[in-house]
């Protein structure tokens, strides 16, 4: 298992999307640092378990990004807990978390939990609507959220989520500049090696999700692109 603070490249797999055994093998053996299992729509215990069982055939670190309490299952290396900092509904900031701890607090292995301070910035994405996120933010707003994530909440991760489209590099650069201990994760619109390399210049962790379902061959090239950039 690769420790989370060593991650540079991650693939995100959606339990609600089809992936062939051949494609899954290519993803899991690509050299990526981890696989995150997670999605927005129709994430169930059954499809989460099905995908997890297939991933576990390979020696790759696997984390569950929790979006629905009913889909939580033991066995993952880590459990990523999103807090949507720019949500306009308290449930997505702390409400769902309180409910989870109230129900499962006695059995939670706290060492496996990693909090993510999410900043959802693509207003057209399903996750923005789902989490009631205020997405019309300027760079200073994003920088403020990054500072909150590190200095007030002390989250291990601050996640810039553009979900399906590539965000402005200036936003990534400015957020990166104010973070020291908190790792900057970027996700959204990474389709090829050039995209990944550009983002890797500033983000600690590059997430490739939708791109692997659209063009697997190009998505696989992002692993080497990120690793090469981090070695410079």
From Swiss-Prot:
Task: Look up the record and name the pathway of this protein.
Answer: Membrane lipid metabolism; glycerophospholipid metabolism
Q: Which residues make up the binding site for Mg(2+)?
A: 14, 40
**Which residues are recorded as binding sn-glycerol 1-phosphate?**
12, 159-164, 189, 209-210
A Gene Ontology BP annotation from the UniProt entry = glycerophospholipid biosynthetic process
Its recorded reaction(s) are: sn-glycerol 1-phosphate + all-trans-heptaprenyl diphosphate = 3-heptaprenyl-sn-glycero-1-phosphate + diphosphate
Question: Which NCBIfam families does the entry link to?
Answer: GGGP-family, PRK04169.1-1, PRK04169.1-3
Q: What does this protein do?
A: Prenyltransferase that catalyzes in vivo the transfer of the heptaprenyl moiety of heptaprenyl pyrophosphate (HepPP; 35 carbon atoms) to the C3 hydroxyl of sn-glycerol-1-phosphate (G1P), producing heptaprenylglyceryl phosphate (HepGP). This reaction is an ether-bond-formation step in the biosynthesis of archaea-type G1P-based membrane lipids found in Bacillales.
Know the name of this protein?
A: Heptaprenylglyceryl phosphate synthase
Q: Which organism is it from?
A: Shouchella clausii (strain KSM-K16)
Q: What gene, per UniProt, encodes this protein?
A: pcrB
